Regions:
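Substrate-binding rim/cap in mid-to-C-terminal beta-strand-loop elements of soluble/periplasmic
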Residues: 109-119, 311-355
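Catalytic-site neighborhoods of secreted/periplasmic enzymes
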Residues: 112-195, 231-240, 246-248
Length: 458
């Protein structure tokens, strides 16, 4: 097993220590031409992930698993609804684990542009722009430019919410959705004649059976989006996971009264237990492949499942991020806040530091990169979009603006209302600045110069 962060050499140049008075001041960008390219800025070369890795000579495979509805409220130790993911909880102790992580959307439509492209929302989500999506750089096209083979696997219909269009525009090599599954085995049960598609077990099997594992293959970037834990939460092994639901409540020492309350959401919790069990099976099978030892896995939720009542506004976006790899030389649990948009810059900086990737010096990333400080803080400005017609949330430091209400985010990611007109005005000004930039994109503005796009996508 990798070492924990307590084994770290605190005198290493790139070690970020634990301090009593952490700085929550927000880091800003040096923009280059805001009127023409509102998000285009000088990129940072700060690589915070390399100190955790012993990487191999060959570029690593990257596997990103986006789990439908996986909220922190019921995931891992400390979850306020109880820990319903025993496998993920175990995996997180062998990983880099961000427990105070945020998705940037309240629904699935926001996840691909955020975690692959670190993009703004435009009017109703970046994907909502359809054919008018401006050219941009992403993990997909930048890694393809650097010799990677890219793929997307989804048990449902990838044309939903223009996901397929976005992926094609990012030059995806292989796109596998429900039309590419050759059997009905694994189809989720129909509800009123409708099924979302194939369950997690079938999705993971499809990935393992169709991705190359030999050492001569190109390095892989694989993105998987699950659907089993989506409303209406009907799964194929329904009774088995109803039984596991009852067993789990007993393991969690629930009183009979509390059990009765939770039974109102039996389908939801059963689907979470199923999701966790299928992830366990996926890793057990992947471990048998020769490429397992050279793979970096990222697991996160696309958003928090809203069908189980939420405790706060921020709860809708509170998801885990687990970064696991056999190449990790130490583990860490981070209480600092980061978001989906921080993933692309950090992954690319890790690879650039170790494999001299050909990447632009200037970028349009919304996120600054993952924060690896273990104590609670937030150095990011994080816009959030709950639905395609509801963009009113903005996080700056440990404050969360929700419309005309201001909340302080607490160390357990709870929040409390605060009355601080000066702070509220400051955050509102920052949010208005983001919305002005975002409106330029909505109205046909560009993300990056054409010359940069052409150089790094050919």
């Amino acid at each position: 097993f990798p070492k924990t962060d307590y084994d770290v050499d605190i005198y290493a140049d790139n070690y970020i220590g634990i301090y009593d008075n952490l700085d929550n001041s927000v880091v800003d960008y040096e923009y280059l031409d805001e009127s023409n390219y509102p998000f285009y800025h000088v990129d940072s070369d700060t690589d915070v992930l390399s100190p955790y890795f012993n990487l191999n000579e060959k570029k690593p495979n990257i596997v990103i698993i986006l789990v439908e509805g996986l909220g922190r409220a019921f995931t891992n130790k400390g979850a306020y609804l109880g820990n319903w993911t025993p496998f993920l909880d175990s995996l997180s102790t062998q990983s880099l684990y961000w427990k105070n992580f945020l998705s940037q959307g309240g629904r699935t439509f926001a996840v691909l542009p955020s975690i692959l492209g670190s993009l703004p929302f435009a009017q109703s989500g970046y994907l909502g722009m359809g054919e008018k999506m401006p050219n941009q750089l992403s993990l997909l096209n930048l890694l393809k430019h650097n010799g990677y083979e890219t793929s997307f696997y989804y048990g449902g219909d990838a044309s939903f919410d223009n996901m397929e269009l976005y992926l094609r525009r990012n030059k995806i090599d292989d796109l596998i959705d429900k039309d590419k599954f050759s059997t009905n085995s694994g189809l989720l049960p129909e509800t009123n004649g409708f099924t979302w598609g194939y369950d997690d077990e079938a999705l993971y099997a499809k990935y393992l059976n169709t991705r190359p594992s030999d050492s001569m293959a190109k390095p892989q970037l694989g993105v998987l989006l699950t659907v089993s834990s989506h409303n209406p939460f009907k799964i194929n092994q329904q009774q088995e996971f109803y039984d596991r639901f009852e067993e789990r409540m007993t393991q969690l020492d629930f009183t009979e009264s509390k059990k009765q309350d939770y039974r109102a959401y039996r389908d939801q919790y059963a689907s979470i237990l199923y999701t966790d069990a299928m992830l366990k099976k996926f890793f057990e099978n992947y471990e048998k492949r020769p490429d397992f030892s050279n793979t970096i896995f990222l697991i996160t939720g696309d958003h928090r499942m809203p069908e189980i009542p939420m405790a706060t506004v921020i709860d809708r976006y509170h998801v885990p991020l687990i970064l696991y790899s056999p190449m990790l030389k130490r583990t860490s649990e981070m209480a600092s806040i980061s978001s989906h948009s921080d993933v692309p810059p950090s992954i690319l900086r890790l690879l650039k530091s170790n494999y001299q990737l050909d990447l632009p010096e200037d970028t349009s990333w919304l996120g600054k990169g993952l924060d690896t400080v273990v104590n609670f803080r937030n150095i990011h400005q994080i816009p959030l979009i709950q639905t395609k017609v509801n963009m009113k949330d903005y996080v700056v430091g440990t404050y969360h603006l929700n419309g005309d209400r201001l909340y302080e985010i607490l160390e357990d990611m709870g929040e409390r209302p605060v009355n601080d007109p000066k702070q509220q005005k400051s955050i509102m000004d920052a949010y208005n600045g983001f919305k002005q930039k975002n409106a330029i994109i909505t109205n046909g503005g560009k993300i990056i110069p054409d010359s940069v796009y052409i150089k790094y996508t050919n």
